[in-house]
């Protein structure tokens, strides 16, 4: 009687983000991106990172229109609904929007960024 040994192998590959900046970390009131700590909401896109003042700062989001296919909006610790006016403006500009809590938005952004997708994220800090 012989015993078969099954060996599972996990393949690891280095993730290459090119010149884009992934979210390296986050915590209460901050994000770490590109080695810098941002103590505010942020907008990340293929062109860089900048401060985001929240839902009333719709001009910064609308400016992403031609550069992206999807915008991930992280609403902080908990998922919350976007103001209807903001949703209407983004949809009117042809921007696909996915709303989730900020930790989920960070992870999703990083995965799709590593795949070279045309995405951006607008993130509010967690509590």
Where are these regions (language model features)?
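Non-catalytic interface/targeting segments
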Residues: 2-58, 114-126
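Short glycine-/small-residue-rich flexible loop motifs, especially phosphate/cofactor-binding loops
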Residues: 28, 84-87, 109
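Mid-chain, well-packed structural core segment of small domains
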Residues: 65-100
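Short active-site-adjacent helix-start/loop capping segments
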Residues: 51-53, 79-82, 107-108
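C-terminal structural segments of small proteins and small subunits
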Residues: 96-124
């Amino acid at each position: 009687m012989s015993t078969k040994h099954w060996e599972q192998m996990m393949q690891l590959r280095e993730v290459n983000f090119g010149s884009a900046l992934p979210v390296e970390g986050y915590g209460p009131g901050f994000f770490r991106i590109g080695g810098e700590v941002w103590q505010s909401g942020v907008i990340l896109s293929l062109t860089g990172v900048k401060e985001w003042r929240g839902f009333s700062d719709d001009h910064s989001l609308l400016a992403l229109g031609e550069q992206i296919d999807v915008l991930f909006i992280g609403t902080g610790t908990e998922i919350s609904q976007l103001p209807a006016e903001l949703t209407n403006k983004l949809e009117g500009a042809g921007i696909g929007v996915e709303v989730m809590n900020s930790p989920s938005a960070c992870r999703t952004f990083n995965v799709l960024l590593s795949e070279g997708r045309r995405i951006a994220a607008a993130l509010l800090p967690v509590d």
